[in-house]
């Protein structure tokens, strides 16, 4: 928001920016820092917003969301990483397997279980953790898309209870909301890349000659180019719908995402 030093952009403006990033194959962790972790922080308390959002705006801080665990797959509530309140601090123990943007991040937002059973929707909390905190170890690795991710191990990592985002044990709904916003941004990035690839393919078919004529005159390739164009346009339409539905009620938003 403008109160936090931003431009008061919404999902549509984020879509436009992400689509342009896709066209340029920008691999910097913008979505992880600004859309995902920024999405959590702007819903935090005033002290958290004042403490952390300026660092994102200035570019001094890079953030990553540590949520994925080997057994969790697509269940965001399936968490074996725990945080136990001990006086003024939470003690975190556990493991996160795929932390996108982790190699560049100096701060993490970590989903942890503070109560309940491993797959319960209640009992999920969000904590801010600095990368240099004692007991936190990171192993970086490349991903198939040319980016990088991290594995993170927490061994009795202590963080202040002031680092809790929102209410303890009630983080599940906020995680679903921000993940939906992230999905919409990633889809926007994807259609930007698809646009460039489709245009490059059409141009190649116009200029590459075989048997004395451009290969774009061959009917089989024309059919393939039409199929590519239709798939691209369908992807654009779906992405627009997802972004327009982000401000709807939970059921409509989840259905679109």
Mark where each language-model region is.
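Internal helix-loop-helix
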Residues: 2-50, 54-60, 100-107, 246-249
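Glycine-rich beta->alpha junctions and the first turn(s) of the following alpha-helix
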Residues: 8, 22-23, 136-233
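Structural signature of FAD isoalloxazine-binding scaffolds in flavoprotein oxidoreductases
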Residues: 8-20, 75-79, 129, 153, ...
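A short, Trp-centered hydrophobic/proline-enriched beta-strand micro-motif
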Residues: 59-68
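A structural signal for short hydrophobic beta-strand segments in well-ordered beta-sheet cores
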Residues: 81-84
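A short core secondary-structure module
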Residues: 93-137
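Charged, glycine-rich active-site and insertion segments that engage polyanionic ligands
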Residues: 251-257
